[in-house]
From Swiss-Prot:
Belongs to the CbrA family. GO terms for molecular function: FAD binding. Transmembrane segments: none annotated. This is Protein CbrA. It holds the Pfam family FAD_binding_3. It comes from Shigella flexneri serotype 5b (strain 8401).
């Protein structure tokens, strides 16, 4: 039975970043359900926007995005829509439009060969015994059993590692649904949509490489019905759909309290969305995935006597920042406060009257 210093479950942005940073410094094995290349197999449903904080992480690491990861067009503003109030506002944002699946595969490709990576693999069982973590996984058509000193859960919203460590822990979850359509809008745009009759979270749209992606986060019970209802409402705001080319869905976490951030125990650690590190106000998680990976790298290389306590302390600033996003989310999803903010015109950038399309309902107050 082979033994490793670190076993990483999941190679999204968090797991890939950590594996790359530990390569050559510790003996690492990493398991991922995505294929090594191509579009077959699992791909993460995601709007695919790289936030400024994530961009800073790449600056820190000296990395630049390859052209095949970057999507077209690049959009510098978000159209925020309050459906009930029939209000639309335009706010500046500095996101990079990316192809999320290509981005994830590129992140994996940066992991050096010294890390033992298993693509298209499935983690079947984990347990702790004799001060070691045991992992049974299936890859290349057969089951393997390894042990590790440290176990890292970078396996997202449905984290197997988090469920094992905290079987009674409850965190609010939504079903994220999005559909792809052939782009029909004369001017590409990115939007953020609030409609409390549909969801107490939010919905979104993004133009990407000739497609129009429309999606949102909805209650688990009747998410599909709510998604369909919102699509019908958006015709009043000049959203154009047509026949769906592709439909996607996944579970997304929505932290709503300080206790929703869990970092691990017993030499097992959680990073990225598995730890609850996702913005409640935007559902953006890549930047926090990269930041938590960097924090855990530093903890591992220092090898403190109590690694879990050290990681908990080191993530304090990150958790405070994310708690601030919870407060912001409560403001944005409060109808009266949101309506007041949008009507005030704060930070709104008006568009010229002869702009080709305005994406507002006839009753909007601009």
């Amino acid at each position: 039975m082979e033994h490793f210093d670190v076993a990483i479950i999941g190679l999204g942005p968090a797991g890939s970043a950590l594996a790359r940073k530990l390569a050559g410094k510790m003996q690492v094995i990493a398991l991922d359900k995505k294929h090594q290349c191509g579009t077959e197999g699992f791909s993460k449903p995601c709007g695919g926007l790289l936030a400024p904080d994530a961009q800073r992480s790449f600056i820190r690491d000296g990395l630049t995005l390859p052209v095949d990861v970057i999507a077209n067009p690049q959009i510098f503003s978000v159209k925020t829509v309050d459906v009930a109030a029939s209000l639309t506002r335009n706010y500046q944002r500095s996101y990079i439009n990316i192809n999320r699946h290509a981005f994830d595969l590129w992140m994996k490709s940066l992991i050096p060969a010294s890390v033992e990576v298993y693509h298209d693999s499935l983690c079947r069982k984990i347990w702790r015994e004799d001060d070691k973590w045991h992992v049974i996984f299936r890859a290349d058509g057969w089951e393997q059993h390894i042990t590790a000193r440290y176990l890292v859960g970078a396996d997202g919203a449905n984290s197997m590692v988090r469920r094992h460590l905290y079987p009674d822990h409850q965190i609010r979850k939504y079903v994220a649904i999005q559909q792809w359509f052939a782009e029909k809008h004369p001017v590409p745009f990115y939007s953020c949509i609030f409609d409390n009759a549909i969801t107490d979270c939010y919905s979104w749209s993004i133009s990407k490489d000739g497609y129009f992606i429309f999606g949102g986060a909805y209650p688990m019970k009747d998410g599909q019905t709510r998604f369909t209802t919102l699509k019908e409402k958006m015709s009043a705001f000049q959203f154009q759909f047509g026949k769906a080319v592709k439909s996607e869905k996944c579970t997304v976490l929505f932290p709503s309290r300080w206790q929703d951030f869990v970092c691990g125990k017993d030499n097992a650690f959680l990073i990225g969305e598995a730890a609850g590190f996702i913005s409640a106000s935007s559902l953006e998680g890549i930047s926090y995935a990269l930041d938590s990976a960097e924090i855990l790298r530093a903890v591992f290389l220092k090898q403190p006597e109590k690694s879990n306590a050290a990681y908990w302390r080191a993530t304090h600033k990150l958790r405070l920042k994310l708690f601030g996003k919870i407060v912001k989310s409560r403001c944005l999803t409060a109808p009266a406060l949101r309506k007041w903010i949008m009507r005030s015109g704060m930070a709104h950038i008006p568009q010229l009257k002869d702009y080709p399309t305005r994406f507002t309902s006839p009753t909007s107050r601009m």
